[in-house]
Every structure is written in structure tokens, then in C-alpha cells.
């Protein structure tokens, strides 16, 4: 367990910048978040890209499916197009580009492997191959999470030294996976805050540190600050400690 609870910017500082973009990550750094949470998919040509959805429709306002497009194709689009404020154009980032710019800057980074809707065969091996380029830094500074426990198991089987968190937002999702398997593979649980509040005994039954998402209430943020089982809160906003 970390000595001090961390505050991670959800998809970067997404309250004031377009989510999962270089601008959102840069502002998270400038506003002194401890780290960021981001989402990773796999392109047609095997590149790890940072985006939440399986398509670019919502963020770039262009109808492309990540797994059917090359990186070059996806780089043509502006992922600030949807945002409430006009910003400089924000092309999609690769995970490598992010690591090159921010791995040394943040204390902790949460990379969500987005295999809950599409499996992206081989994505875990791609992540491992990229991580190896940075020595021990990824093992020390990155927590990999997913709603798809099989994806976490595959990453663990490749290298059991990765920090891994099981992500869930329903009671059914949590109970669908054997508790002993979760304990073997994961160092953390990342429950939706509402599930933790509704079923605290269930969530705490594994005695794993918690990363809570997504905090939008300052009252709840300070409430969870007092919870010794919470190692990190993931928020769209910057709350003052």
C-alpha cells in the first residue's frame, strides 16, 4: 500500500481538456495530479492507441472503428472536435508517445486495457513488448486494469510482476470471477464508487487496496480520503487536499 493516497486524472484532466489527448495529460501534469488514467485499444496495424471508445465517432466526430483502421488513418482526425471548448487540434496518441512524454513525470499511471467489448487478440503481448523498452519503469509506475479478467490473466501469465487491477461496476461482474484467481493475479481492485458504497463488505472481502472511479463530488472525495483501503481516487476534476 502506498503511504499517501493518490489522485489520478480520469482520461487526463478531462474536465478542462478533451479526454485522452496530449493536452489533457499535459494539463494533468501542470495542475499536479499524481497521475492519470487512460484507455488503450489496438489498431489494424497493431499499434496501441489511447482512446476510450471502440470508434472515433464521439470524440473526433468521424465514423471510424479502431480495429479496422491504421494508425496513419486515425492520426488524420482531431479528437478535440467534440469538446465544449475550442482547442488546438488533438491527434490520437499512441501509448508509446505517452510513455515517452509522461512516464517519468507522473507518480502512477493507470492503463485500462479496453478488451471488454472487443478482445483485440495479442494486445497483452503488444503491451509487454512496449513496456520492456522502458526497463523497470512500467512495472514500477503503471497499474494495468480491465473489465475483462481474462485479459488481466493473460498479462499476468506473460509477466507476473506487472501491477494489475480488476475493474468492475456491477456486483455480477465481481462475483463472476473466482476470488482466489483475483487474489493471485491482482494487487488492486478498481470498483465503481457506487458499488463500493452499496456493497462494501463484498468489495473489501479480498482485502485488496482500492482505486475508486469516477469522483465528481468534493464531499465524496474528502470522505474517501479518510478510507485507508483506498490507494487512489480517479477524478475528472482537481480536488484540493
UniProtKB/Swiss-Prot annotation:
GO MF annotations, alphabetized: phosphoric diester hydrolase activity
GO-annotated biological processes: lipid metabolic process
SUPFAM superfamilies: PLC-like phosphodiesterases
Keywords: Hydrolase
Domain GP-PDE: 5-241
Gene3D superfamilies on file: Phosphatidylinositol (PI) phosphodiesterase
InterPro entries according to UniProt: GP_PDE_dom, PLC-like_Pdiesterase_TIM-brl
Record-linked Pfam families: GDPD (PF03009)
Family per record: To glycerophosphoryl diester phosphodiesterases (EC 3.1.4.46). To M.genitalium MG385.
PANTHER family: GLYCEROPHOSPHODIESTER PHOSPHODIESTERASE, CYTOPLASMIC (PTHR46211:SF1), GLYCEROPHOSPHORYL DIESTER PHOSPHODIESTERASE (PTHR46211)
Name assigned to this protein: Uncharacterized protein MG293 homolog
Amino acid at each position: 500500500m502506498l503511504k499517501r493516497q493518490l489522485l489520478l486524472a480520469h482520461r487526463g484532466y478531462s474536465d478542462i481538456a478533451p479526454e485522452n489527448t496530449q493536452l489533457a495529460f499535459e494539463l494533468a501534469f501542470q495542475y499536479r495530479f499524481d497521475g492519470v488514467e487512460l484507455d488503450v485499444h489496438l489498431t489494424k496495424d497493431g499499434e496501441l492507441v489511447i482512446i476510450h471508445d471502440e470508434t472515433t465517432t464521439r470524440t473526433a466526430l468521424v465514423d471510424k472503428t479502431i480495429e479496422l483502421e491504421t494508425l496513419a488513418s486515425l492520426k488524420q482526425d482531431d479528437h478535440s472536435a467534440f469538446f465544449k471548448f475550442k482547442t488546438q487540434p488533438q491527434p490520437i496518441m499512441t501509448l508509446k508517445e505517452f510513455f515517452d512524454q509522461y512516464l517519468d513525470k507522473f507518480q502512477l499511471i493507470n492503463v485500462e486495457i479496453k478488451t471488454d467489448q472487443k478482445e483485440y487478440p495479442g494486445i497483452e503481448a503488444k503491451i509487454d513488448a512496449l513496456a520492456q523498452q522502458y526497463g523497470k519503469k512500467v512495472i514500477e509506475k503503471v497499474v494495468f486494469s480491465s473489465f475483462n479478467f481474462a485479459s488481466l490473466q493473460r498479462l499476468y501469465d506473460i509477466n507476473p510482476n506487472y501491477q494489475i487491477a480488476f475493474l468492475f461496476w456491477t456486483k455480477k461482474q465481481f462475483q463472476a470471477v473466482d476470488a482466489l484467481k483475483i487474489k493471485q493475479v491482482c494487487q488492486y481492485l478498481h470498483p465503481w464508487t457506487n458499488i463500493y458504497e452499496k456493497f462494501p463488505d463484498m468489495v473489501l472481502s479480498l482485502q485488496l487496496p482500492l482505486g475508486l472511479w469516477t469522483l465528481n463530488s468534493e464531499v465524496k472525495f474528502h470522505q474517501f480520503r479518510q478510507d485507508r483501503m483506498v490507494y487512489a481516487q480517479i477524478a475528472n476534476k482537481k480536488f484540493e487536499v
